[in-house]
C-alpha cells in the first residue's frame, strides 16, 4: 500500500517536534508512549479516549462485523486523530503520539475492501489531509515502529480483556492476521517514502529497555534539543 503514497507532487516536507509510536494492535504503544513521554517531559497524546462514547460504540460494532459502522469508525478516528495531531504540534512542545494518520489508511484499506466506492472517498480525504500534514503541520521527527509476533499479539489481546476484542476474536482473526502480516512493512515503507527517521523495536522487550534504545538513538543523532 505504501507504494501508492507518491510524494513527487509535494512541496518540501516539514518536520515537526514530535515522536510517533506505531504498530499493530496490542503492541504496547500506549505503554511506551506514556513511558517515553515521562522520560522526555513531553506532551503525550493517546490514541483512545476511554470516555469517548461514540468511539466505543463504533469500535464495538466494527468488531461485530457491522460494515456501515466500520466506515463511520474509520472516518471518525481519522478526523479525530488528525485534529489531535494538529493541536499537539501547534503547542510547539515536544509531543509523543500514540499512532498517526499514516496508520489510519492501512486500517481503512483492511476494513473497507467490501466497499471500494467508500474507500475511494476515504482515500481522497486521507491524501488531502496527509498533504496538509507533511508540508504545513509537519511529519514526526522520529517514528518508533513496534514489531509484534502473532502469538504475542493473541496473548496480549486476551490479557488486556477488552470485551469487544475478545468476544469477537474468532470472527475477526482473519482480519487481525491480514493486518499483522503487513503492518511493519507498511510503516517502514511509508517512513522511507516521506523521509521520516524511524526505528523498528521488538515489542517483547521490556518498556524500560525500549526507552533506553530510543534515547540512545535520539542522543547519538542529536534529534531533539536538550536530550
Q: What is each of the regions a protein language model found here?
A:
Residues 32, 36:
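Hydrophobic positions on the alpha1 helix immediately C-terminal to the Walker A/P-loop
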Residues 21:
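Hydrophobic anchor at the beta1->P-loop junction of P-loop NTPases
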Residues 24:
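P-loop (Walker A) phosphate-binding loop of NTP-binding proteins
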Residues 29:
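Conserved lysine of the Walker
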Residues 69-137:
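Glycine-rich phosphate-binding loop used to anchor ATP phosphates in small-molecule kinases
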Residues 106-182:
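A glycine- and Lys/Arg-enriched "phosphate-lid" helix/loop adjacent to the NTP-binding pocket
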Residues 3, 154-227:
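NTP-dependent small-molecule kinase module
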Residues 38-81, 107:
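Conserved substrate/cofactor phosphate-moiety recognition/catalytic segment
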Amino acid at each position: 500500500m505504501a507504494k501508492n503514497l507518491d510524494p513527487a507532487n509535494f512541496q518540501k516536507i516539514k518536520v515537526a517536534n514530535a515522536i510517533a509510536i506505531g504498530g499493530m494492535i496490542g503492541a504496547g504503544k500506549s505503554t511506551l508512549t506514556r513511558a517515553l513521554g515521562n522520560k522526555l517531559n513531553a506532551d503525550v497524546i493517546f490514541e483512545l479516549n476511554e470516555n469517548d462514547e461514540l468511539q466505543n460504540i463504533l469500535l464495538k460494532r466494527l468488531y461485530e462485523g457491522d460494515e456501515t459502522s466500520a466506515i463511520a469508525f474509520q472516518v471518525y478516528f481519522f478526523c479525530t486523530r488528525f485534529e489531535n495531531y494538529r493541536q499537539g504540534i501547534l503547542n510547539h512542545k515536544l509531543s509523543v503520539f500514540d499512532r498517526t494518520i499514516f496508520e489510519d489508511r492501512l486500517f481503512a484499506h483492511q476494513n473497507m475492501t467490501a466497499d471500494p466506492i467508500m474507500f475511494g472517498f476515504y482515500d481522497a480525504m486521507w491524501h488531502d489531509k496527509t498533504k496538509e500534514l507533511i508540508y504545513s503541520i509537519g511529519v514526526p521527527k522520529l517514528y518508533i515502529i513496534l514489531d509484534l509476533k502473532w502469538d504475542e499479539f493473541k496473548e496480549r489481546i486476551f490479557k488486556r480483556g477488552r470485551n469487544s476484542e475478545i468476544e469477537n476474536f474468532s470472527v475477526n482473526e482473519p482480519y487481525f492476521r491480514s493486518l499483522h502480516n503487513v503492518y511493519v512493512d507498511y510503516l517502514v515503507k511509508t517512513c522511507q517514502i516521506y523521509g521520516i527517521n524511524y526505528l523498528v523495536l521488538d515489542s517483547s522487550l521490556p518498556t524500560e529497555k525500549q526507552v533506553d534504545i530510543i534515547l540512545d538513538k535520539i542522543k547519538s543523532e542529536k534529534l531533539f534539543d536538550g536530550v
